[in-house]
Design a protein with these regions (language model features):
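Non-catalytic cap/lid and distal C-terminal segments of serine-dependent acyl enzymes
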Residues: 1-280
């Protein structure tokens, strides 16, 4: 039940949560620094033939300038919505604080709605189409984003991590940075949610990208993180080993804890400073 006296809330996939923010976290607090803006954006999806929603973070100074920015697509989990990263995930405040501390470059962060139908698994292909055919073109039309591969990143948690793998490796020529939080190829270790039975295994479907040396050359970072108590730990480990087998250099870390926002916020704090870094 929502607290009617608490204005802070977060939309999940099927209900609302009341939020209580406990101060003290270095990069999650609301600090006296320049703040960007988070907008709720409606767009018409030609692939899904209906109006859809996403949240978009623009960094401090975006509205008053003409500069173009790199773009980071940040995907939510199966119990969440496009609102989740900017509310319970504190993504806007995290980015403000990282940018103010000069730990992360100013960037546009796009948080789309990962659910395209009643179930995430059965409708996964619909979201992938919506992402490539509608979300990316809409962002590049409406916002001053740099459109080359080296200035485009994607990451996601849980379901969003699986979507990052599906979209990222099917379109590896478009992304230089990929992050997978508490996720992997579902079913690869006999746990998690398996792929649809009428599809070949993920490794087979993506063989052209996995074994393409030209695509690997432009890929600057593949980053995985999972909690030691996460129910998808074996899935993450098996996915990392599979990618290494195909010659990918994967950064992998295991943290304390499980499948929780306590970890995912920390992963964003660690991942965002690695993006769009010319030294990589």
């Amino acid at each position: 039940m929502l607290d009617p006296r608490n204005p802070a809330g977060s939309e999940s996939n099927d209900n609302m949560w009341s939020l209580v923010v406990v101060p003290g976290a270095e990069f999650m607090d609301t600090k006296d620094v320049p703040h960007g803006a988070v907008a709720e954006v409606t767009y018409q999806s030609s692939s899904l033939k209906r109006a859809r929603r996403m949240h978009v973070y623009t960094p401090p100074g975006y509205e008053n300038g003409r500069k173009s920015y790199p773009v980071f697509y940040l995907l939510h989990g199966s119990s969440d919505s496009d609102d989740s990263w900017s509310s319970v995930g504190r993504a806007g405040f995290i980015m403000d604080n990282l940018i103010a501390a000069k730990k992360a470059k100013p960037m546009i962060v796009v948080m789309p709605a990962g659910h395209s139908g009643p179930t995430a698994i059965r409708n996964g292909k619909d979201f992938e189409r919506d992402f490539v055919e509608d979300i990316m073109p809409q962002i590049e039309k409406r916002y001053r984003v740099q459109t080359d591969r080296s200035n485009r990143a994607m990451a996601g948690l849980s379901m969003g991590g699986g979507q990052t793998l599906n979209i990222g490796f099917a379109n590896l020529d478009k992304f230089a940075y990929l992050g997978v939080f508490s996720s992997g190829v579902f079913g690869i270790a006999g746990g998690g949610r398996p792929a649809a039975t009428n599809e070949p295994p993920w490794e087979v479907r993506n063989k052209a990208s996995l074994d393409n040396p030209k695509l690997k050359k432009g890929l600057k970072l593949v980053w995985f993180a999972t909690g030691k108590d996460d129910f998808l730990l074996k899935t993450s480990r098996a996915t990392v080993e599979m990618l290494k087998k195909h010659g990918f250099s994967v950064v992998y870390k295991e943290s304390e804890g499980g499948h929780t926002w306590l970890n995912w916020r920390d992963y964003l704090i660690e991942f965002a400073p690695l993006l769009f870094n010319e030294s990589r």
